[in-house]
């Protein structure tokens, strides 16, 4: 008997997952997509398998806005293991060197300020960045080390939460593209003992925090009790990641033309920048940008 093809649901929204340790971001996405039986899905930037915490997952029309979440600032809590360096900069790598730890709390506190603000980071070899079309982690697994250009990142918070040698727990708030593994390795180098990430938990991704995150266990339990439809309660609106943007509500007349790809005028709109756009009923219909002549040009539209 031929297998009946599963008909996926055309759902739309954002689900904030508390990603479990040991699972890649894509594995987590595909698992939740299967539970929701969703037609279209995407995530908003990878978390290492070692890491846990906030991973916003976009479904349906919300995938059109995932790039803007990818660009958002992030927050983390990380356990820094001093005295040991590894090939990957975290606990999943092979041992490179082991040294005695004579670092005191004051030593660590005094080292932190140099890593706050705008700093330069050299991306790790074990990363998804590409060199001549090849992911760096694949080159690293083949034993290759290639030159990487330093990149500017911003660390807005770097605080010591606890100090229990040889481990220390740090709170980090940072711009996109920041590698906490590299931050910890560089800090270990300054301290003279080396270090790696023993644990990493993302606490914030743009406007989303741990308080909004749902565990995979919860999703599986609710799915077992009520099927895919029971999980819709965890979906947030498509524009949930853009609530810090200005909002513009169009008249019925203007919304009609705007949804057909035509820039429109709106006297109450800001003079520049990006906007969340709503129709006359307050329904989110897409994002727009103010053009040089003051009109609102549609950039990404919600399919009705």
UniProtKB/Swiss-Prot annotation:
Is tRNA processing among this UniProt entry's keywords? yes
- Kindly report, in one word, the top-level EC class recorded for this enzyme: isomerase
Q: Which CDD domains match?
A: PseudoU_synth_EcTruB (cd02573), PUA_TruB_bacterial (cd21152)
- Gene Ontology biological process: mRNA pseudouridine synthesis; tRNA pseudouridine synthesis
Q: Where, by residue number, is the active site?
A: 48
Database matches in InterPro entries:
PsdUridine_synth_cat_dom_sf, PsdUridine_synth_N, PUA-like_sf, PUA_sf, tRNA_psdUridine_synth_TruB, tRNA_sdUridine_synth_fam1_C, TruB_C
Instruction: Provide the reaction this enzyme catalyses.
Output: uridine(55) in tRNA = pseudouridine(55) in tRNA
Chain coiled-coil ranges? none
**So what EC number does this one have?**
5.4.99.25
**Which molecular-function annotations from GO does this UniProt entry contain?**
RNA binding; tRNA pseudouridine(55) synthase activity
Q: Name one Pfam family in it.
A: TruB_N
Which superkingdom? Bacteria
Keywords recorded for this protein, A-Z: Isomerase, tRNA processing
Q: Which family does it belong to?
A: Belongs to the pseudouridine synthase TruB family. Type 1 subfamily.
- Protein role: Responsible for synthesis of pseudouridine from uracil-55 in the psi GC loop of transfer RNAs.
Q: What is this protein called?
A: tRNA pseudouridine synthase B
Identify the coding gene: truB
